[in-house]
Amino acid sequence: MSEAEARPSNFIRQIIDKDLADGKHTTVHTRFPPEPNGYLHIGHAKSICLNFGIAQDYQGQCNLRFDDTNPEKENLEYVESIKKDVTWLGFDWSGEVCYSSDYFDKLYEYAIELIQKGLAYVDELTPEQIREYRGTLTEPGKHSPYRDRSVEENLALFEKMRAGEFAEGQACLRAKIDMASSFIVMRDPVLYRVRFAEHHQTGDKWCIYPMYDFTHCISDALEGITHSICTLEFQDNRRLYDWVLDNITIPCHPRQYEFSRLNLEYTVMSKRKLNQLVTEKLVTGWDDPRMPTISGLRRRGFTPSAIREFCKRIGVTKQENMIEYSALESCIRDDLNENAPRAMAVLDPVKLVIENFAAGTVETLTLANHPNKPEMGDREVPFTRELWIEREDFREEANKKYKRLVLGKEVRLRGAYVIKAERIEKDEQGNITTIFCSYDPETLGKNPADGRKVKGVIHWVSAEKGVPAEFRLYERLFTVPNPGAADNFAETINPESLVKVQGYVEPSLVEAKPEFGYQFERMGYFCADNKDSSPQALVFNRTVGLRDSFVKIDEE
């Protein structure tokens, strides 16, 4: 397969291919420009994979630029978490990290240029009045009474804004475009506002801050961005993007292209709604494994390669659509099935005693870490007289379809012997407390000598050598596919989205590294929690089941 065939094709790449073929550009330069006012989520991952992926495939560059023009909502914690997430996803930015605040001096100069050209003015309408004067989709706006101030007056007033002589909301700088435009974004948009807030990069140097639409296009141009790629909600803003660059003296004029944002079933990605989940303690934090944040997915056990594959599979289009959550689960399931070592864990234990196995004896069995990858090696698993098995793997009576342990019948223990359930003990409530079995010592790694068929295989953990563990069984956070459309999305939270159970794991898992994925045989894919797990108190998060657990729910 050629390099071109290996690349995922989409309309943006077709534009880039044409630009390069026509000689419009000789190289490709993209950027990923998050605002450092929150944690990145799976929707941002789509943009990261697109922008950094394009730069990689075309041997170009991609900048990481923080759009830090709103100091009241931004801080260094978000800056560091975003850098960590981008790196974790497998990407590296070109050169140093960029900040829009790096260009505050330049932006101020460009604002003065617009004033000097009669294309910007200082307005003293209140924010409420500005909204009122803006008009509606069906009615044009009306001019501010301050719109026709002279250039000299506007320059003097803008300098006073910078000097801190206006209170917040008392004055702003607006572009002079067209109050009757059919695009509301072009009705004299605000370019600068007064904010007496300390900035995490520039300190208290500034008390006026540029708006996103003024900053974004100029930052792109100053960095030499060739293709400015953003989501569809900025489609109308492209007119303002071009207007600003057309009316200032700047050598580079990037072009903006829009694609559809990611909409994923059974989750929300609105920053406001995610913040509500955290502040109302409906989840444990931004890195709760049920959250769609990169940090939450990482803690749950999602791998960078699975997220990149998901972004590749869903593609890049201009059409808004809802992606099935199972598509994301399929990517991590495929990844871990291929790469995760196997281990055994019992989540709902009942004791099994092999009466003809010598008490106090520990037999060390050797089990493969992966059934199809001998290069992943083996592990030693202790086998003892007393074991734990899953409660659901035993029945007193069952039909022929039940391929697990039944009273009076045989089953094979994974990687070990054939056993037969001989009798049981129950407590006063009728619950089975112990299953007493016999084992066939001639069946380790081979079938019974007399040719009898034993079809079922169940997993187990030594009761004497196994290690206690907590298992956090995560499911989708919401019960409806589109919780964001509900009147109160919080009422659609799935009460079964987290169930905690206590069980046992084989001893090799004591040293399990946080976030490293395992297949717990027959139970699903799990990883040690990166906050709460320790060798002294193991905590495993279920990343995803062996199959889609919601299929049955949907069918019902």
Curated annotation (Swiss-Prot):
It catalyses: tRNA(Gln) + L-glutamine + ATP = L-glutaminyl-tRNA(Gln) + AMP + diphosphate. Its EC number is 6.1.1.18. GO terms for molecular function: ATP binding; glutamine-tRNA ligase activity. The keyword ATP-binding applies. It is found in: Cytoplasm. ATP binds at residues 35-37, 41-47, 231, 261-262, 269-271. GO terms for cellular component: cytosol. Transmembrane segments: none annotated. The keyword Transmembrane does not apply. L-glutamine binds at residues 67, 212. It comes from the Bacteria. Pfam families: tRNA-synt_1c, tRNA-synt_1c_C, tRNA-synt_1c_C2. A motif ('KMSKS' region) lies at residues 268-272. Keywords: Aminoacyl-tRNA synthetase, ATP-binding, Cytoplasm, Ligase, Nucleotide-binding, Protein biosynthesis. Belongs to the class-I aminoacyl-tRNA synthetase family. This is Glutamine--tRNA ligase. It comes from Vibrio cholerae serotype O1 (strain ATCC 39541 / Classical Ogawa 395 / O395). The gene is glnS.
